[in-house]
Amino acid sequence: MQRSGVKAVLQPCRHPLQSECMLTDTPPPSSTQIQVAVVMRRERVQGAMSRWQPWRWVLADVVPNEAAFGEEPRQLRHGDEEEQWLHPGFLVQLHRDDAEGYYLNATTDAPCWFVMWRLEEQATVAAEPIARPVMVSLSYYDAGRWLDAQETVEQVPAPVEIVQWLSGFVEENHVPEPKRRRRPESFRSLQDRFG
């Protein structure tokens, strides 16, 4: 999906990653894209807040996509205190023009995945509406744009393999903008300062 001037980093994908290995055994991606699945958790609200909202949805994890996940969301766990849902088939692509956003993420103490999600208006796969991830990114700028648009954005730590992959991309593609010295206002004529 592309909008003018903004490249979306998530596309629903019909060709999941062919790797059948677990996250710890997954080699870092060799290209500029990786397919992932998002795990959302519905948990019971405790305390006084539970009078108004008995349940809440939170982002649980982002994992490499596997062919065994299929294409549709599915429930992984159901209990009295929580449910977990797996949402497969998200393609995360790294774009050169967003290298600074990746740089800001990769150089923090805790690089992370950013996931924008929305609650279904009507239930489609369960008895009640579930949280549906919409986009996944590794860019601070993407997360900022989504938050500016009043979307729900959550984050979870990215594994070491993904951080190394992201750092390699940043090293190859990020070019810091040169700092320009601004002339102090006091040295500009009144015409320049006030039009």
Language-model segments: which ranges?
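Amphipathic alpha-helical interface segments used for dimerization/assembly
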Residues: 162-174
